[in-house]
Amino acid sequence: MAKGDIVLITFPFTNLSGSKLRPAVVLADTSLDVTVCFVTTQIGWQENTDVLLIPSSINGLRKQSLIRTSKIATLDRTLAMGLLGKLSKQDIDNLDKQLKILLQLP
């Protein structure tokens, strides 16, 4: 896995009451863990730092989706069930920009 990959992964609910298999964008990958942002098709709930994704053969998405930059998790890499696709260079640049805003980085 590499930064910008879109994977299917078991992602925990924010209240830790359960989890759901969902697409997520890889931010970082180590030998044991992967850090991801989850992806949702609930575009009506868009926040300022979310990144809109348009479905394409490259990213493997079927519907318009949002990268929820505020929903970041570091998970065991064995929870990743498969590769859906990859972000375009433009989408990666946009993701980086929005993460800087979210994390208040210069």
What are these regions (language model features)?
Residues 1-106:
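Conserved functional hotspots at enzyme active or ligand-binding sites that engage polyanionic ligands
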